[in-house]
């Protein structure tokens, strides 16, 4: 049975927040209430849909129990009642998922970091392929993509690329992409047709706002320098490149991609906030891991999560034993949702099983 008292409390809170937002609260309160309301919208809608269906079923059951109901209506009501009960089951399942504890960062934008791993030039090329896959996927979703930092590979692709992906719910969709991605294919430079294996690591961080992380300017060491090209030569005459070191954590951010020192500093600070926030998040996750029963993989970014086998056109996600023979569509971003949605569904199923067994 669903906890009706809890459902009542959620609806009352949803209505209370909606009312308070019409009273012109101060900016900080408005932001806080808006976030809370956004977190309750889905579950409030699910509760109302579930209860509306319950009301419909009660009405049909009363009609069937009424001896005055005309015979021709009885058959119609019985058929409609069966359909309504099926809909109710779907509404209840959706509501149970909506009631699961929410990741507070799910609605945030994200920082995407891709780094070439083992495999030399081929790893850098694969890192480039992965970035283009996520870029196309993001564009299809209507999200914004802005490159924050890039180090190009000698034969193409990227040794490292960091990008900001902005939009509602970006982190919820991409957070399970963190880990080691392995590729198996024949490089263009391979003359004997041998399959090579290389890898790239992906890290997806929730984008932190200033309200999420407080950074003391006294804790920062900021160096400016002239931006450098791939061969180490200076590419402009002004000291536009920025290196920020967060002394308490030792986190170092270097950004040189804009000609403006001001823009590079803003990008570096945004990335620094997200790195510090994510480090705290990872620490909390590690502390909870012993008690948490529902998890897709370990979340460890060194964990091999997926293999892309180009000769066979096969993608395998090792965490949920998912295999798709449509690698070309995954790499264009077209079929990536099939993988992501399967991971989310598996995670939610594990959460439901854990909550029901608690």
Swiss-Prot record:
Its main location: cytoplasm. Keywords: Cytoplasm, Methylation, Protein biosynthesis. GO terms for molecular function: translation release factor activity, codon specific. It comes from the Bacteria. The keyword Cytoplasm applies. SUPFAM superfamilies: Release factor. It holds the Pfam family RF-1. This is Peptide chain release factor 1. It comes from Beijerinckia indica subsp. indica (strain ATCC 9039 / DSM 1715 / NCIMB 8712).
């Amino acid at each position: 049975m669903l906890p009706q008292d809890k459902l009542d409390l959620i609806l009352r809170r949803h209505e209370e927040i909606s009312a308070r937002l019409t009273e012109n609260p101060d900016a900080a309160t408005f932001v806080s209430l808006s976030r809370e309301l956004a977190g309750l919208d889905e579950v409030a809608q699910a509760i109302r849909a579930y209860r509306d269906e319950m009301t419909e079923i009660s009405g049909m059951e009363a009609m069937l129990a009424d001896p005055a109901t005309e015979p021709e209506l009885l058959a119609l009501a019985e058929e409609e009642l069966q359909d309504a009960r099926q809909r109710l089951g779907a509404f209840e399942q959706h509501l149970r998922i909506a009631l699961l504890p929410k990741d507070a960062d799910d609605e945030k934008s994200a920082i995407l970091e891709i780094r070439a791993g083992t495999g030399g030039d081929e790893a850098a090329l694969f890192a480039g392929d992965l970035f283009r896959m996520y870029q196309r996927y993001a564009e299809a979703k209507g999200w914004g993509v802005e490159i924050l930092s890039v180090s190009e590979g000698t034969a193409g692709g990227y040794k490292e690329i960091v990008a900001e992906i902005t939009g509602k719910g970006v982190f919820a969709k991409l957070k399970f992409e963190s880990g080691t991605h392995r590729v198996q294919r024949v490089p263009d430079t391979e003359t004997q047709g041998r399959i090579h294996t290389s890898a790239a690591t992906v890290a997806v961080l929730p984008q932190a706002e200033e309200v999420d992380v407080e950074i003391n300017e006294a804790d920062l060491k900021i160096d400016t320098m002239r931006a450098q090209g791939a061969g180490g030569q200076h590419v402009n005459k002004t000291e536009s490149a920025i290196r920020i070191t967060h002394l308490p954590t030792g986190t170092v951010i270097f950004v040189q991609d804009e000609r403006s020192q001001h823009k590079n500093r803003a990008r570096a600070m945004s990335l620094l906030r997200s790195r510090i926030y994510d480090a705290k998040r990872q620490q909390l996750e590690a502390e909870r891991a012993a008690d948490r029963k529902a998890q897709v993989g370990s979340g460890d970014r060194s964990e091999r999560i997926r293999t892309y086998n180009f000769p066979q056109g096969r993608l395998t996600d090792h965490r949920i034993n998912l295999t798709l023979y449509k690698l070309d569509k995954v790499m264009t971003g077209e079929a990536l949702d099939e993988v992501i949605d399967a991971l989310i569904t598996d995670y939610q199923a594990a959460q439901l099983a854990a909550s029901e067994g608690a």
